[in-house]
Amino acid sequence: PLLVKGELDAAAVPANLAATLYNKTNGAVEVACINTLGVLYIVENGETVNSVGDLKGQTIVTTGKGATPEYVLRYVLTENGVDPDSDVTIEYCSEATEALSKVQAGEATIAMLPQPFVTSAMSQVEGLRVALDMNEEWQKVTGSKLVTGVLVVRKDAVENDPEAFAAFMDGYAASVEAANNDL
């Protein structure tokens, strides 16, 4: 990646990738801030899922095998007494549109999707509803918010020009503030 090669100073990445980058670079790439909290939801075309336990015996279509969505789903299931390997079937799709297509075609009734895709999906599939907010489910079992995205920086870039980094972070914070309050 360009960040590791030193061609970029910062990047917004999934939280699990940040951990990998930190480890692979021996701390040369580190997290500067969290930029995305819980964006994952279990949606259902039906009314059977009202708790994590209700997923037992069900098929869940989702994306993110080997990434944050898989880890979140498996952890929340396990902590609620649902074995992700034997109590449910998890079918991984390459992207959210593929998962939605399966729900639209009636091949699946339950999917785990990220926002803003959930909102779009609900307008496309009559009867589709948010059954579980995975951020809430994560918080119930961990006591912390679900971090899904972060801003990472090259440590040497920050150390070489701390004023530029501080100015960047001020601008970044102002951008977040504007997005949250002015739209």
What are these regions (language model features)?
Residues 1-93, 107-115, 122, 127-134, ...:
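Short, glycine-/small- and polar/acidic-enriched structural segments
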Residues 15-17, 91, 97-183:
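Pocket-lining segment of extracytoplasmic ligand-binding domains
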